[in-house]
């Protein structure tokens, strides 16, 4: 397993299932510091149980104030996968 994304902070939206979930897992496997967002708590909880290194956050990306607050809490992001 390569660690070419080690020390990179990556946000993946819609990460609860499908392409978003697969992408979050792939980035995690490459050593990234992954922050996964979705509006479905259940799928996020499952993702976090299977991959405890992935940080999960219930976030509605259509809510501008919520997104701004989340972004501010992260300080710097290297990659945003939407």
Task: Describe the function of each predicted region.
Residues 9, 14-18:
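Conserved glycine-rich cofactor-binding loop
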Residues 14, 37-41, 61:
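N-terminal Rossmann-fold cofactor-binding loop
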Residues 9, 33, 55, 76-78:
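Structural signature of beta-strand start/N-cap positions in the alpha/beta core
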Residues 13-14, 77-82:
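Rossmann-fold scaffold of SDR-type NAD(P)-dependent oxidoreductases
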Residues 30-46:
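Conserved glycine-rich Rossmann-like NAD(P)H-binding loop of the short-chain dehydrogenase/reductase
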Residues 27:
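Aromatic pocket-lining residues of Rossmann-like dinucleotide-binding sites
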């Amino acid at each position: 397993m390569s660690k070419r994304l080690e020390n990179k902070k990556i946000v993946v939206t819609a990460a609860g299932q499908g392409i978003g979930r697969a992408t979050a897992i792939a980035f995690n496997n490459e050593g990234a510091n992954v922050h996964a967002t979705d509006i479905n708590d259940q799928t996020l909880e499952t993702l976090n149980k299977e991959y405890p290194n992935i940080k999960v956050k219930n976030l509605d990306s259509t809510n501008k104030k919520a997104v701004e607050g989340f972004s501010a809490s992260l300080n710097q992001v290297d990659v945003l996968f939407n």
